[in-house]
Swiss-Prot record:
Keyword Amino-acid biosynthesis: yes
The protein, known as: N-(5'-phosphoribosyl)anthranilate isomerase
SUPFAM superfamilies recorded: Ribulose-phoshate binding barrel
Gene it is expressed from: trpF
Source organism: Hyphomonas neptunium (strain ATCC 15444)
The reaction(s) this protein catalyses: N-(5-phospho-beta-D-ribosyl)anthranilate = 1-(2-carboxyphenylamino)-1-deoxy-D-ribulose 5-phosphate
Pathway: Amino-acid biosynthesis; L-tryptophan biosynthesis; L-tryptophan from chorismate: step 3/5
Xref: PANTHER family: N-(5'-PHOSPHORIBOSYL)ANTHRANILATE ISOMERASE
EC top class, as a word: isomerase
A GO MF term: phosphoribosylanthranilate isomerase activity
Amino acid sequence: MAKVKICGLKDPDMVAFAAREGADWVGFVFAPSVRQVTLAAAETLLLSVGKATPVALMVDPSDAEAQAVAALGFPILQLHGQETPARAAELKSLTGCAIWKAIGVQTRDNLGQIGTFPDIDGLLLDAKPPEGATIAGGHGAAFDWSILKGWTAPKPWLLAGGLTPENVAEAIAATGAPGVDVSSGVERIRGLKDRELVRAFIRAAKASEQP
């Protein structure tokens, strides 16, 4: 049974629904995107997280931006930009938050950079954004899961990129992912989560068997 993160939420009712359905984490985007939320909106959304743990997705945040988000009570910052290992460590010290780093995967070589981030608390392996993309994630593209064959994760990690209710069980079986992250894969209209898809994704992931 894998853990589940539903990312890109911006409606309090949907946040509460995802938490009730069993999402372990609920993610809020603080970067340019159709799913972006403001600090004020996030403060309201946090009231609906229930037992789920909130995660703040940020892209190359300044000190002030990271501190403002952390001050809302987020325990985890997910860095989705070009943050260096030193910058990740700085943000961890500055905010007191756990730090997850998103790593774009296209080839096996991309996994090599993970070892350069000793101070992070978790990893999110996502498909590398398409060339010319203006946002870091939520593209609905998957990477070749066979790249992870024989790989041993040095940190807790989540699989992301192109996951849907239809393929998440296969993805978990193929990679052994202990957790999965979804955004566009549970949307029928871009930027708007669909209850049926959210429920189906969580149930499929929770019912899956890891190798």
